[in-house]
Amino acid sequence: YPIGTGAWKVIQYDTDQQIIVQANEDYYEGAPEIKQVTFVKMDNEAAFSNAKSGQLDIVMVAPNYALEEIDGMHIENLETMDVRNISLPCIPEQVVKNPDGNEVTVGNNVTSDVAVRKALSIGIDRESIINNALNGIGKPATGFTTNLSWGNPLVYEDNQREEAKKLLEDAGWIDSDGDGIREKDGVKCEFDVYSPSSDQQRYLLAVAVAEDAKELGISINAKQGTWDELTAKANTDGIVWGWGQYSPTVLKSLLYSELFLVGDYDNTVGYSNEEVDKLIDEAIDSNNQEDAIKKWKEVQAVSAEDYPYLYIVNIEHSYFVNDSIDISVDTQIAHPHGHGSPIICNMKDWKVNE
């Protein structure tokens, strides 16, 4: 085998169906104990059904399945950096020209008030939201991630209801008509939050956040749509996003002012902060890892004062695992966003239980 060959070799690849890999007996760290693994593409319900019938040994499931029981299998809830946040447009509603010269509507007259964004961030009860939406599976998040070297250094207390209410009142958001929703200058403290119709987990999070926000006098309308519909709404409404990359450059996508209106997913909130832009440039240009990490942490510390995103949860990835298989939890690494397959990162360490 050539230099750089891994612990596995692909012996069969059927597009959109399955991949079969076989242990590399000549792997330099020793051949894996498990000799062959088959990956099968299925939707969640089909995968869960096949696990129950004994046809699958490992299956990833959404939190609504994680409290189920399957004979001969156990649940593993694995640590991630897979964060869910809601984007909160930072500029008032207005019509601007995009890079193609077309006029587009951007901004939101409610979320553009930093008092509203901060009140939500400090006022919601993340533990309650996670319990209601995700069966309690996940860890409260107040920033992008804390389990990487460049991760968010700031963790603050939430569920500060009274402080959040005072913040809103001091900013002029008052419930003057007694309907439970605050107003300011004739504008209701109300906005829409969209989640992809393909991801029920995100919709349940939006619903749980909306229920919690009522306690603050903020009305959030949880809605669903296709990704095309979501990208069309991303500059004017809240979106429940999923993020989780090992590289800190994702922070540029979220926060760099020049990226507004450039792509479908970059800085959809119209965030602009010269100090943050400068820190991002310095972090990317740095040829010293320690200095770059320091800059990325400063990026998060400075931008956190503006609350452009409402961070909710670092979800955990839930897997049913056959009792006969040891997936070596101790050598798992924090999983990235769900598009990856991180559970297999240590597949060479997996063993069959005696």
Predicted regions span which residues?
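Extracytoplasmic/periplasmic ligand-capture domains
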Residues: P2, A7-A133, S149-D179, V187-P308, ...
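Active-site-proximal polar cores
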Residues: I312
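Low-complexity, intrinsically disordered regions enriched in charged/polar residues
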Residues: K139, T249, G270, S341-I344
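Long beta-strand-rich cores associated with HINT superfamily self-processing modules
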Residues: V321-E354
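Histidine (H) residue identity feature
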Residues: H74, Y256, H317, H335-H339
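Mature extracytoplasmic/periplasmic domains
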Residues: I137-Y156, H317-N322
